[in-house]
Amino acid sequence: MPKIKTLRSAAKRFKKTESGKFKRKQAHLRHILTKKNTHYKRHLRSKVMISKKDIQKVRLFLPYL
C-alpha cells in the first residue's frame, strides 16, 4: 500500500500543538490595513485553535504530523 501524501498547502497553514490540537493564523491582516485600528490588528496577530468540526479534516490532510 502506498504512503499517504501530505497536503502541502495545509502543512503551511496549520501547526500541531503539544496536546494534539491545531492552531492557525487569523484572516483580515493582508491588505486594506489603514482603516483598521491598531488594537484590532494586534488582536489578529495572535494564533487561534481550529474548530472541533475541522480537526478531522485537517488530520486527513496531515497524516504524519
Curated annotation (Swiss-Prot):
GO term, biological process aspect, one: translation
InterPro entries: Ribosomal_bL35, Ribosomal_bL35-like, Ribosomal_bL35_CS, Ribosomal_bL35_sf
Domain of life of the native organism: Bacteria
One of the record's GO cellular component terms: cytosolic large ribosomal subunit
Pfam families (UniProt xref): Ribosomal_L35p
Any one Gene Ontology molecular-function term assigned to this protein's record: structural constituent of ribosome
Keywords: Ribonucleoprotein, Ribosomal protein
Location of the region described as Disordered in the Swiss-Prot/TrEMBL record: 1-26
Similarity field: Belongs to the bacterial ribosomal protein bL35 family.
PANTHER family referenced in this protein's UniProt entry, alphabetically: 54S RIBOSOMAL PROTEIN BL35M, LARGE RIBOSOMAL SUBUNIT PROTEIN BL35M
UniProt-recorded name of the protein: Large ribosomal subunit protein bL35
Organism: Buchnera aphidicola subsp. Baizongia pistaciae (strain Bp)
Gene that specifies this protein: rpmI
